[in-house]
Amino acid sequence: MTTLQESITMLTLTHIADTHLGHRQYGLKQREDDMVSTTRAAFQEMIEERGTDAILLPGDLFHSRDLRPKILHQIEQELERIPDDVPVLVSRGNHDENLTPRDVTWLNYLHQRGQIVFLESELKANEDTAWFNPYDPDEPGQSAGFYDIDAEGVEKPIRVFGLQWRGAKSGLALQQVAEGIKETNEMHGEPAWTVLLAHFGIEDEVPTLGGTVTHGELRDVKDVVDYLALGHIHKRYESGGWIYNPGSPEAHNTREGRADWDHGYYSIALNDGSAEGNSSSIGFDVDHHPTKRRPYYQIAFDVTEYESPSNLETAFREHVQDEQAAITDHCSQSEFMAGGDPRAPIIDLRFTGTLQFSRGDFRTDELAAW
């Protein structure tokens, strides 16, 4: 993060990813609603508290590639709450792709309606160079390649490019993108500052989660990009002062709900660079903000010492009662509050040890319901 105490903020961007709207986790409608309400709260915070001039969303706006009408309607309602002068710049993630080949995706649909700007790279025309079409508000088409944002006090634009999910082909696509950005800037003029939206994991950044892209494959991209806005990995990570991955707004499994997983969004304040003594450069200050999400809490119970179902049930109830104060304390953290009250947690119930009676008498559903 670059800290610039005396610089003047010219533009504020916010960066969120992996909203997964429509995800009915565990088959629960409440979790589907959580995805929407957490994203809504983040958008509202970006606008009212961060004063964002544009929202960056690199992939997985949706959870399901084939949307139910209700989910599409909810997404449109949330996008309509965002002021018209705050563009929502979106690239495609793996969950946003169609299950079957079609010419038009739901991102194309929202782009054509003016609710988002869908950015993607044309990678098929030239195997060495990506092609990027400028966004035209009068003729938006089905997508655009880049979007220019005017910043106060700067003659050149802030330019945002998009690269769609490419999976194992991401490394090759990034080489095409690096060349394509150079050619685009020669054709349309050099920008003051450059953002690339992309959806992939980086090797070794988050151990055990894997990644399809190496730092070596990003070397050419770094020469032409100032801020790589990533999505795909649901855990926050940053690298090299130019790579940022905010973590999904909501945790999508018990592992993601652990305390060592940060979830949220970034605000990026662009400034004139005067605090560094270089008035001709663009400086930037990046802050991470936790999203207001539903907490997870793990309860572990060792069954080994109980010789009958009734003894186990009594001990289990006492154990859960003993955990109540800790649960309340955990859920009272600021990121788990809704309207001033703690949100009810998702309980991750783990039974451990060796059962001393018939497994058929071990009624886990009844214990979980209690």
Show which residues each predicted segment covers.
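A short, flexible beta-alpha/helix-coil linker loop
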Residues: 20-23, 60-64, 201-203, 250-251, ...
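N-terminal active-site segment of His-dependent metallophosphoesterases
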Residues: 2-78, 84-85
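Short, internal active-site loops enriched in acidic
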Residues: 34, 61-62, 95, 351-357
